[in-house]
Every structure is written in structure tokens, then in C-alpha cells.
Amino acid sequence: MNTSRYYQYIFPGTIAFSVVLMLIGLSMGHPEQLLPGLWKIVTMQDLLITDYIHIAGPAAAFVNAGLVTIISILIIKLAKDPFNGFTIVEMGLMAGFSLFGKNVFNIWPIILGTWLYARYQKEPFSKYASVALLATALAPLVSYMA
């Protein structure tokens, strides 16, 4: 059985997943609460586990999860890292932990640090893109220290 032909569906499937997360968020709250909720998520000093649904409401939390997931998908795509089963695991982790702790702001320093490391090693970022996304498990520390 040739499973590699199924890999072509991972990219559109993960994009659809992130769009569904954002649509769930948009349907769960009033639109006027969305931007203040996202602002609260981004500016709040996070501990390792901060429940964004409790802090900012389900609308902002699910939109944040969708945004972080789509950013992660684009990082994998732009790095030309192949989409495979591990990509699905990464997107699930990124989406899940975006409901408590990760946000569109605090993931960037870790991803940038990984990119700089790849440049320093003179290796393609695609070799480290998955590691960068998994390393964002420490993203709440960025918010805590900022």
C-alpha cells in the first residue's frame, strides 16, 4: 500500500483544521469581545499553564489556537519541511497548547532562535522547523519574562 499519496492531503487538512478552530471561536462569542480577548491573551503574563478560555473567553481562545496553528503550518510549508504524520502531531500539540500558554506573540522568540541556530550551523531551517515548533512548549516563559 502506497501511503505517500495520502501525504498530499495533510497540508489542506491542517489548514482546514485551523480554519475550523477560528470559526468555532467566531461562533462562540460576540465579535466585539474578540479583539480585547486576543489583546488580553497576548499581553498577559503567562505561567506555564494559563487557561485562555477562563482569561479571555472561548472566542478569543479558539481564534488564538487557529492563528497559532496556521502560523505553524506556514512555517513548515515555507521551510519546505515535508508534511507527514509527525506534522499532524505537531499541529495537534500547537492547537491544544494554544488554548493555555501559547499565543501568537510568545512563540516567535523560540522560532527565531531556532532559525538563527540553523543559520549559524549553515544548515537549512527545514532540518529544525519541527524542533522549533516543539520547542515552543517553553513559549509561556517568554510571556512570563517579558
Label the predicted regions.
Residues 1-102:
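N-terminal signal-anchor module of multipass membrane proteins
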Residues 64-72, 76, 88-122, 127, ...:
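Alpha-helical transmembrane segments in multi-pass membrane proteins
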